[in-house]
């Protein structure tokens, strides 16, 4: 996910590896000459933080919640090995921590990018990202059209986190899901709650 602001670009989710981050940066250059100055690690898993090293190398600041930074510190090597079990070609990446952390919710791009933490879900630390001007919610790995990988999910808290999201009454018309088909309407929240209910029965 990419947000092109007035003066610079914010990348939401650092991608899987330095190479995928480089490819994304090249695609961004085809859209805008504005520099990438901020990258949000939206959770501590490699698909959201694996490209940190590349983005740092081009001068971007890596940003996350303190919880994400703490989980990266504690579990990064373990998570790389976990990915390699399913994808043996995945590189052994060193830990690259965020440059700046927040205790909870935070805003970037003058309020155009709002990171929201509502509790455990797909991971203990996953955040939503809300773009109020565009009326778009990025669902991260938390919202998608299939249950997906729940190995690190808190199944008892996951529905509560989604209910808290609903209670915010954010003004969005589009949800960008973290995996599979990306574009959905607000109904994706209830659809995913129904999927979770089938898992927790």
Predicted region positions:
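Solvent-exposed, polar/charged alpha-helical surfaces in well-ordered, non-transmembrane soluble domains
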Residues: 22, 26, 30, 53, ...
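Active-site metal-binding motif and surrounding structural segment of the metallo-beta-lactamase
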Residues: 6-8, 19-63, 169-171
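Extracytoplasmic/periplasmic copper-protein system
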Residues: 69-70, 195-199
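Mature N-terminal segment immediately following signal peptide/propeptide cleavage
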Residues: 1-5
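Metallo-beta-lactamase
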Residues: 8-10, 16-17, 70-192
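Extracytoplasmic/secreted cell-surface and envelope-processing proteins
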Residues: 20-21, 47-50, 71-73, 147-148, ...
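Generic beta-sheet signal
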Residues: 64-65, 139
